[in-house]
Design a protein with these regions (language model features):
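Internal intein/HINT superfamily modules and their associated LAGLIDADG
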Residues: 1-117
């Protein structure tokens, strides 16, 4: 099976290169919204582009080098329920540490109350 059509391939990329975390977003000075986020940043644009194409979701952002000898990097990012959907698909391929982190985010999302604190 081709890597570009294989869930295990992309789960491996996220396991090794990705970040999973909760992001806060303050709105109207009264509420703090909390969202699960999946992010993967690297200099290989083709890999970042293939993540977006495979999962059919997310945004790609370009980052210019901060120093002359650095390369341009690209970040693919998904948040909210779509991030949870991806975690649920990929969790069986993750390492133990990543499974634990994914389960924390999934539980948070499941137990949220309109996602507002």
């Amino acid at each position: 099976m081709s890597g570009l059509n294989n869930l295990g391939y992309f789960a491996g990329i996220l396991d090794g290169e990705g970040s999973f975390f909760l992001e806060t977003n303050k709105k109207e000075k009264r509420y703090i919204y909390i969202y699960p986020v999946i992010s993967c940043e690297m200099t290989d644009f083709d890999v970042i582009q293939s993540l977006k194409k495979f999962f059919k979701v997310g945004h790609i952002t370009k980052f210019e080098p901060r120093k002359k000898h650095y390369k341009i990097s690209w970040r693919w990012r998904v948040r909210g329920g779509k991030a949870i959907d991806i975690l649920k698909l990929c969790i069986k391929y993750f390492s133990i540490r990543r499974k634990e982190k994914a389960n924390i985010l999934i539980e948070h999302w499941k137990n949220r109350r309109d996602n507002v604190v």
